């Protein structure tokens, strides 16, 4: 198998915003030639799939400006600062967006969202044993909440009705976990 690693030669900062940075790196390719890689640097994010004892999942409907439409997705958000504990961020996002406070969190894995254009990683958690209180949405957040049976979400993912990748993966992982225990 041939070597695939590219070596960074230099970096130019193109844009430095509140949520992401855009950089242009000059790299040395495995064959010794050079090329340019442009990508977004992201602080990282978390996603939480909150599942109630009866199998319903608390979902969000939220307008996503880059796509110009409302998405149906699980609660999620970016880390507030570099080095923030992802589980703490997941707890914060669940509380702020849904008013949910869970006693149990299970790490479901890490997702590299779009590796060709960003280094963003989303750490995903299953939240269970949840109590609810008032939400604490940011002033620029507008989110509608909806409880949906996990079986219906699974059907929606398989039918292509849920377009959000983190939600698809979280639903499939939780479905697989539940199926494993059902068949024991």
What kind of feature is each model-predicted range?
Residues 21-25, 70, 121-123:
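Short beta-strand micro-motifs in enzyme catalytic cores
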Residues 3-5, 47-92:
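Conserved Nudix-box catalytic region and its N-terminal flanking loop in Nudix hydrolases
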Residues 22-24, 36, 60, 74, ...:
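Hydrophobic residues on conserved beta-strands that form the core of alpha/beta folds
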Residues 2-12:
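A short, amphipathic edge element
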Residues 35, 44-47, 78-165:
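Unchanged
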Residues 171:
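C-terminal boundary of histidine-terminating zinc-finger modules
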Residues 10-47, 53:
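Acidic, metal-coordinating catalytic segment for phosphate/diphosphate chemistry
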Residues 31, 52-56, 63, 128-132, ...:
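Short loop segments at secondary-structure junctions
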């Amino acid at each position: 198998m041939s070597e695939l690693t590219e070596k960074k030669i230099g970096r130019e900062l193109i844009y430095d915003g509140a949520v992401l940075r855009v950089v242009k790196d000059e790299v040395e390719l495995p064959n010794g030639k050079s090329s340019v890689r442009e990508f977004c640097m992201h602080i990282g994010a978390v996603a939480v799939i909150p599942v109630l004892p009866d199998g319903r999942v608390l979902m969000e409907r939220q307008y996503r400006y880059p796509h110009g439409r409302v998405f149906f997705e699980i609660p999620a958000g970016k880390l507030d600062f570099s080095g923030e504990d992802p589980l703490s961020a997941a707890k914060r996002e669940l509380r702020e967006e849904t008013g949910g406070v869970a006693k149990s969190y299970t790490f479901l894995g890490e997702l590299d969202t779009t590796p060709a254009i960003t280094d963003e990683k989303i750490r995903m958690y299953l939240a269970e044993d949840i109590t609810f209180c008032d939400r604490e949405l940011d002033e620029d957040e507008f989110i509608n909440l909806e409880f949906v049976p996990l079986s219906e979400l699974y059907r929606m993912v398989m039918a292509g009705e849920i377009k959000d990748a983190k939600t698809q993966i979280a639903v499939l992982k939780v479905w697989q976990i539940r199926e494993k225990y059902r068949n024991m």
